[in-house]
Every structure is written in structure tokens, then in C-alpha cells.
Amino acid sequence: MPHPLLDFAPEVRSALDAGAPVVALESTIVTHGMPHPQNVETARAVAAVVRANGAVPAIVAVVAGRIRIGLPEEILDWLGTAKEVLKLSRADLPHAVAAGLHGSTTVAATMICAHRAGIRVFATGGIGGVHRGVEETLDISADLDELARTPVAVVCAGAKAILDLPRTLEYLETRGVPVVGYRTDRFPAFWSRDSGLPAPLRLDTPEAIAALMRTKEALDLGGGILVANPVPEADEIPAREIAALIATAVAQARAAGIAGKAVTPFLLSRLLDLTGGRSLSTNIALVKNNAALAAQLAVALRGARSSGPQAGAGAPGAEPGPARRTSPARAPSGEGW
């Protein structure tokens, strides 16, 4: 039975009804993660990558209080420049829906909406996590608890390097979230392939990840999994190089009194300037890379045959081969993606 608060793009609804692979995509990257026009261009490019790897893309957002699973082109264009759009996590989602507001969905909110829609795989850039200075602020992203409670696989390039990565991994372990390095023994750090920390698990094919998900469900453990997919080597910013720039940006945020949800957008904006635009180009590359793997995982989960590249071979930068081991402003209306 359709959920009364969800509106599906026709293509997404048809795919779900047919049991075809679908990949959820967040909308915060459009409203808060990238400048215009790269934000909208990237959203379209990521959707194209999902299609090329055999799945249907479903960008998630809240428009005038309705949860949209898949966005028509005119709404995507509008989101790219809209100003009255909230950044929604678990705590904000019911308010935005009840009040008829507009909102873009973070990792946590996208997971919730994807699960309600029957979508099991979600591609994003990087998750939130434990913020630096947490002993003073208690600033921990809701993404982490959502991974522990909502059964969706999140494919990302690790946690954002602006965070306290050791504590983020510790928190995920405590909450029982499997963290899988895809074809790597190292936990990636968004712009960099190696955070300096080991990946808790390693799997080398989408089919192996799908088997992990099925087994977790069979054991009735609840919650999702995190798939950490390193940025392609040609696109990365080495960890040592980005670390100094992050330290500068963090110091600037503290000096300016930036806190809460405003921290991540501020730091990303500062890093865009400090890297001369490289952080944005790397971000775009890693999101596409994650979208390819997410689509392959969705295909593997459905047991469907993709008409695109063989599973495991389509992700940019991936090395093919066998596994080595296991009253807001009015939004435009429209139907269709």
C-alpha cells in the first residue's frame, strides 16, 4: 500500500513495483553541498551513472510538505538555486512535512525516506560523524544512529575528513554497524583514499556486499551497513595535503562561532577556496564513483542482470577481478523524473 506522505516519480514507482533495482540519492548535495550550477549538473550526472549501471535513480527531497521519491527536472532546477530550503535530518523531517515546508534530505533523512519507499541502497558523497572537539560540543551526526536503526546500505567515500574519524569508527562499532571497505583494507577519508585507519571489513564484489546484507537481515540484527568506496586515485587529494587545509578551516569556523548544522557547509565552502576548486572536482568524482557501485549493489540485491557493465567493473577507478577476500516559497510542480 502506498505511503500517504510519499509521492513517487512514475519511473521510480514502476521500477519498485516491478522489483527492478533502484538507488536513492540525497538532495542536500544540491542545496547545501555544492555551488550552482555544479550542484544541478552533478545531480544529473550522478543519476546518469546510476542508469548506466543498471538501476533507476531516485533523488529524495521534501517539497511543500510532500516527500518526493524521484524529482522531475523542473524541481531539481528549482532546488539548485532555492533559498528557503531546510536541511533535514531525522529530527526535522516530521516538522517540514507537517508544516508544508521545503527541505533537502541529509544522509539520515534520505535513509528514512528510502526505507519507507522500499529502496535498499543509497549513494552519497560522505556520511556525517563525530565532530572534532566532541568532548566540548557533543556534536555527533544523526547519520550514525540512523545507520544503526534503518536497514539501508549507504555507499560513500567514507566519513568527511573534517570529522574525528577514529571516534566516528568507534561509534559505528559500538552501534553495531558493519563498515565495509570496498576493495581496500583502509578506511577512506572522502577526498583521500586512506585516512590512516584500517577498514573494519573488506569485500571485493557487489555480490559479496549483497550477501552480507541478506545475512544481516536473516539474523534480524536491524540497521544498515556502510560501504566505504575510496575516491578514484586520479581524483584524490592526498590526506597530508588536505589535513593542513582542514585545520585552517576548522580554526576559522571556531573563530566565527559557527556551530551545529552550519559547520559542514561552512567548512566545505572554505575548503573550496583553500584548494582552489580541487575539493569540488574531487567531490564530484567520488559521488559518481559511489553511484556506480550503489547501482551494481542494487542489481546484485535484486538478483537482476544489468544491461550495463558487469557488476564490479563499472565503478570509475575500481580494479576488476575476483575477490581477494571476503509558508514557504512555491515550488514548481511536475511529474516524472
UniProtKB/Swiss-Prot annotation:
Binding-site residues for substrate, renumbered to this chain: K87, V107, S141, A142, D143
EC main group: lyase
EC number(s) per entry: 4.2.1.70
Plastid found in the keyword field: no
Alphabetical GO biological process terms: nucleobase catabolic process
Function of the protein: Catalyzes the reversible cleavage of pseudouridine 5'-phosphate (PsiMP) to ribose 5-phosphate and uracil. Functions biologically in the cleavage direction, as part of a pseudouridine degradation pathway.
InterPro entries on file: Indigdn_synthA-like, PsuG
Amino acids binding Mn(2+): D139
Organism: Methylobacterium nodulans (strain LMG 21967 / CNCM I-2342 / ORS 2060)
Family statement: Belongs to the pseudouridine-5'-phosphate glycosidase family.
UniProt region (Disordered), positions on chain: 306-337
Catalytic residue list: E26 (proton donor), K160 (nucleophile)
A single GO cellular-component term on record: cytoplasm
UniProt keyword annotation of DNA-binding present: no
Protein's name in the database: Pseudouridine-5'-phosphate glycosidase
